[in-house]
């Protein structure tokens, strides 16, 4: 963000403050469980390259944009879609201004777009094929559930130190308060971009930037409201722009949380705030500007400060599991599956299984996602059917799963399993001796 804001304003002070604001967004407070949502740092780098290309015509800058855009999208698939909106806005506005003097831009931009699409074919093809083959898509009702209300931008995370007891608390995906300092400076930047600058800057160029980033804010805001935009819980329309795009853009039905389009709001506000900082700085004495910048940086940091409530993980290891994983670590590489596949508290225990791969180093069938694979669903369906383990083991062998780990102590009396299932299932697997290379017992864990 420092690069982008500095290149736009010509001021290192404005760039530094924009970088601080973007790094300390209050939005971060609820996103520790979804670290991939915080991987938005390539956006300003890409836009920096994009602006440089339009201002200089250098193809190296266009390459920087393309690489940063791809890195951003591959870091988080949501941003392939949402960040594309920002790129389209900047590209459209800049082309309207510059294409008449440099028509070759159209050819260069088209060639770059084709190369970017070609580089994404392996990932996009796999993504779309898996989605089609396993019917992996997010329903409209899910999108509505994870959309932001218009007032969510004044709802604070309960983790925020400064605002949690003052502002209304929002849901984890809908606590979108950007901070009053950022909002104020962005408003000053938007208005200031249409005024005459004392240092002789091109007022048309500054106005163009102000309009561009305001459009990015507006688009992000509208998209974050999801298929059925609401204000204070009141339905504004039964079908909004996100709903229209949902039906025509390939792969968009794989996104669950429209509220994450708010990153465009924060991106646009930060750039506008940088313009606002520079606008005020040119109106003040150097000493006053320095004090003001220092105070503003402190406010950005204070508004974005939060206290994370983390649960210690992993818990104290169970000796039998530890012994099983120690043994597994010494074995040749091969796929592994750990039973029960739906232990008590599925999310926490499945994550424990995934965490165990750091110890035993074997690739794991188990995993947690918003989606369930057909393999996991099949195993869940037949896990308690001891007569099905002959076919189950044959299927796992066909998939080159080499190790099966069973923890008897993780079977509990629940709706989907009973405490007595562990020994029964262990016996059913051992009865398939002709399909087993070896069996090892570690307390209440079998491998």
Predicted regions and their residues:
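Membrane-embedded helix bundles of polyisoprenyl
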Residues: 1-96, 109-124, 296-305
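Membrane-interface junctions at the ends of membrane-embedded or membrane-associated helices
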Residues: 6-10, 51-64, 92-107, 191-204, ...
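Membrane-embedded alpha-helical segments of multi-pass membrane proteins
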Residues: 37-46, 84-85, 178-181, 261-272
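Hydrophobic, aromatic-rich transmembrane alpha-helices
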Residues: 114-118, 180-207, 211-224, 276-279
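Extracytoplasmic
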Residues: 139, 298-447
